[in-house]
Amino acid sequence: MNFTEIAEKLKQNQVVAYPTEAVFGLGCNPLSESAVKKLLDLKQRPIDKGLILIAPDLLYLLPFIDTERLNSRQISRLTANYSHPVTWVVPVKFGTPKFLTGRFNSIAVRISDHPAVAELCSLTGFALTSTSANLSGLPPCKTAAEVRSQFGQFFPVLDYPVGHAEKPSEIRNLLTDQLIREG
């Protein structure tokens, strides 16, 4: 499918697969509880784990981040360009749905330089959820063909290549700088 078709599916609160820096991600409208529940069911992922939100710039992520708890240095780190993808665990804004944060009082966000992420966010007007596109026990998909192989021929997938990152994103806590997952 092309960008316009995938953006329409996202606006209709469907789950889609799209390329990120290293692998294909499963995404949906983060403010649609029904879409997030479909995503969690598809991944067989417990709701208490929370989800990563991804966007091309901070503006898409601001509705979810408690910026009052961040200083200018932390905001700079959050928005900096890195040689590899970095996901930051940040204070969550009051009112952010629990179906996004899980059992945490924080939320994981990543500013992505992948052109597909930028285009989809621009077409939909919202950030995307991001969890690796793979069924439980199988490796993450690196091509649209692999997504179709795991999720079925008619699953909505954006035909566009993944980026050049070798591994999934590093995950760090922005307040403590604790490394949660190596990238």
Curated annotation (Swiss-Prot):
Keywords: ATP-binding, Cytoplasm, Nucleotide-binding, Nucleotidyltransferase, Transferase, tRNA processing. InterPro entries: DHBP_synth_RibB-like_a/b_dom (IPR017945), Sua5-like_dom (IPR006070), TC-AMP_synthase (IPR023535), TC-AMP_synthase_SUA5 (IPR050156). Required for the formation of a threonylcarbamoyl group on adenosine at position 37 (t(6)A37) in tRNAs that read codons beginning with adenine. Catalyzes the conversion of L-threonine, HCO(3)(-)/CO(2) and ATP to give threonylcarbamoyl-AMP (TC-AMP) as the acyladenylate intermediate, with the release of diphosphate. It holds the Pfam family Sua5_yciO_yrdC. SUPFAM superfamilies: YrdC/RibB (SSF55821). One of its GO terms (molecular function) is ATP binding. It is found in: Cytoplasm. Its EC number is 2.7.7.87. It comes from the Bacteria. Belongs to the SUA5 family. TsaC subfamily. GO terms for biological process: regulation of translational fidelity; tRNA threonylcarbamoyladenosine modification. GO terms for cellular component: cytoplasm. This is Threonylcarbamoyl-AMP synthase. It catalyses: L-threonine + hydrogencarbonate + ATP = L-threonylcarbamoyladenylate + diphosphate + H2O. Residues 1-183 form the YrdC-like domain.
